């Protein structure tokens, strides 16, 4: 666990540079599950990397499924974190072999929820009760109209917006998660949202609450709007990739 802890501490130092806070949270949660697993199954507080065998991750998988009663999606995320730390340790020469190199598991095929045109219009025109709800709706709709994820919106600066010679506005940047470049044309609906947040600060959305808070609020907003789908912030990216791109002829 000392190696896992060092890896997690390194991740924390890279938040906002090339890693997101959510990634750090995921590795932190994995480490806590590993600590509980070692205590419950091995009666130890740590284990040397050289002692790891494929049976370790197989037992960890079963532990997460039975003892922790986690969903398959969550289990796969935690297994991925453990596999990655061991792989990096092997590549860095910290351990002589990778005991998990041949380990395979079945990942779930997620159902990608997205809003249709009617649901987007309902959300746009809903009379929401509080300023906080209206702000979170704007954040979500901006993601719907641009495909930009939560982590990248959190660091979105006004200087990333540029107008071309035809008068069209574009936003460019590098994704926090992958460091890949993105270029997105700003549709009129997205520009309309931006106009409400010109407050003289460097960042477009300087009020960004924690993602868990946003998702909880979106759940309540969906109920108020009569939208029966499970609304999370990530649904915004899927909505852009489906409904918005089709509506605007974006490939």
Specify the residue positions occupied by each region the protein language model found:
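Short basic/aromatic active-site micro-motif
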Residues: 52, 135-137, 211-212, 228-248
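Short, aromatic/basic-rich helix-turn unit that serves as a nucleic-acid recognition element
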Residues: 2-31
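Short, polar N-cap/turn motifs at the start of nucleic acid-interacting alpha helices
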Residues: 160-166, 228-229, 249-251
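C-terminal catalytic core of tyrosine-transesterase DNA break-rejoin enzymes
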Residues: 141, 145-152, 220, 237-251
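C-terminal catalytic core of Y-nucleophile DNA break-rejoin enzymes
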Residues: 175-220
